[in-house]
Amino acid sequence: MKKQLPHILSLSTVAKSRLFEIQAVELKFSNGIDRTYERFRPFNRDSVMVIAIDGEDLLLVREYAVGTEQYELGFVKGGMDMGETPEQSANRELQEEIGFGAKKWTFLRKMKINPQIMGHKMHVLLGEDLYPNQLEGDEPEPLEIVRYPLSQLDALLDSDEFNEARNLAALYSLRDHLKKR
């Protein structure tokens, strides 16, 4: 039996910046209990994460993360533009961030980032058969490209500098995909 969704009684904006809007969502659950939650306002813009393989290496980027106030190692990622497919967006982001496009794309999975407070979805794609092509991106500084041997995926999973949850989930998806080949 499908569980009845709570009824939304009201929505209001409690805070807003140029990047985020936080909403208070007043709900009534099927058992009669009222509760107010806060969430990021839903937006209809998914994102992509690109696992790029060049020969026997993963191509990672090291870029500044203001949340941790340090440089973090991870996969290429970015927002999808209106009208783009995940593959088109992934190819654009790859060219903007590391100067390569990919001829072969494999969809690995879709992830929800934090569904308790946001409706955002991220598409994880594997890009192979790379070719050089640089597009202008929106990064404030050039990103460092880091080659990591595919033969050392377990070491990367254990690395202290590769520890963001989305990257780890994507790397496990890649490992499962490669085992099936």
PLM features per residue range, with description:
Residues 13-18, 30, 42, 66, ...:
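Acidic pyrophosphate-coordinating catalytic loop
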Residues 46-49, 54, 80-165:
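Unchanged
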Residues 34-37, 73, 146:
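Short beta-strand segments
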Residues 13-49, 54:
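Acidic, metal-coordinating catalytic segment for phosphate/diphosphate chemistry
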Residues 1-17:
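Extreme N-terminal tail/first-helix region
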Residues 2-5, 40, 48-92:
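Conserved Nudix-box catalytic region and its N-terminal flanking loop in Nudix hydrolases
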Residues 155-181:
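Long hydrophobic alpha-helical segments typical of transmembrane helices together
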